Amino acid sequence: MVGWLSMPEAMITYRGVVYPWHCDHMGHMNVMWYVGKFDEATWQILAAVGASPSRMRTEGFGLVAVEQHIEYKRELRAGDLLTIRSSVLEAWEKSVRFVHQMTNEESGELAAKTVVTGVCIDISARKARALPHDIFRRIASLNE
């Protein structure tokens, strides 16, 4: 199966707060924490399409990030509540592209956005392989 898919509605994949230790010398959340929170959101969307960590371990496959582009839009400060909403932008036989949007829950402002491309690999062979068919079908069903 090869194809382009889009998911029109985003799902909530992360809710959290900015703690003081997330902030740098300028008083806003440091970039390392954006990446970490986006990574947590990725695990949630993967699980939603059937690619849970336990399944990956059991079946010997994984999804590895091969590209990530981040846009920082608004600062987040200690105490800010945030939500990440995620969608699948595209999926092909061996790869998938997600978008995550991080918003300040109180103001509703977009704080950051990232697009991540992941490739499915065979853990033992360390080579790209096809996404399991049921996962590809679940991604497709999100668009229905």
Regions found by a protein language model. Give the residues of each.
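Terminal targeting signals and extreme-terminal segments of soluble enzymes
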Residues: 2-83, 89-144
